[in-house]
């Protein structure tokens, strides 16, 4: 795959969509850029009959609700979306049976920060301020294989319903999620 290409699993349609050669990409690195970027994307998709495939990071949450807090950003954009002509239906390349390299993951937070966050979540639940929190943090690792291979192994191991592979150029996003965050149909 090349920069800008993507695979998206569509559980409802029972297929995978392959997006190739974006006509444009849109990225937002600051919270203040997220909503204008989404508005511009929506306009272009409607006007130019394009498809949009990408991601919005959890850290973009304050763009939608200023009461939300998110940690300071890093070099990963808060939003990255490719604009494409119609995708092709298909399946990602099959994974050959072979052992996977050992990957040593490093959390983006230390143990004390994790313990503090869990204590705060428990306090909020006990106080009745929330009933559920989806707590996440980033993991980083040096891969001993191409990101595409890691993605195929993740899909084979997890059998997710809403997997996605996004080659954003400088970054690759591999997601093996069991649920869809949002979908916009016209």
Report each predicted region and the residues it spans.
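Extended alpha-helical targeting/anchoring segments
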Residues: 1-186
């Amino acid at each position: 795959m090349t920069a800008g290409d993507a695979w998206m699993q569509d559980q409802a349609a029972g297929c995978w969509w392959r997006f190739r050669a974006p006509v444009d990409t849109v990225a937002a690195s600051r919270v203040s850029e997220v909503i204008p970027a989404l508005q511009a994307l929506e306009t272009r998709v409607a006007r130019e009959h394009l498809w949009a495939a990408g991601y919005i990071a959890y850290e973009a949450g304050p763009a939608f609700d200023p009461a939300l807090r998110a940690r300071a950003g890093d070099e990963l954009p808060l939003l990255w979306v490719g604009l494409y002509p119609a995708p092709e239906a298909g399946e990602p390349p099959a994974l050959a049976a072979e052992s996977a390299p050992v990957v040593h993951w490093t959390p983006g937070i230390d143990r004390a920060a994790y313990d503090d966050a869990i204590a705060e979540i428990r306090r909020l639940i006990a106080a009745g301020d929330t009933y559920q929190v989806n707590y996440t943090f980033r993991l980083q690792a040096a891969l001993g294989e191409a990101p595409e291979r890691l993605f195929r192994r993740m899909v084979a191991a997890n059998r997710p319903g809403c997997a996605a592979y996004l080659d954003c150029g400088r970054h690759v996003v591999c997601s093996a999620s069991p649920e869809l965050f949002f979908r916009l149909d016209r």
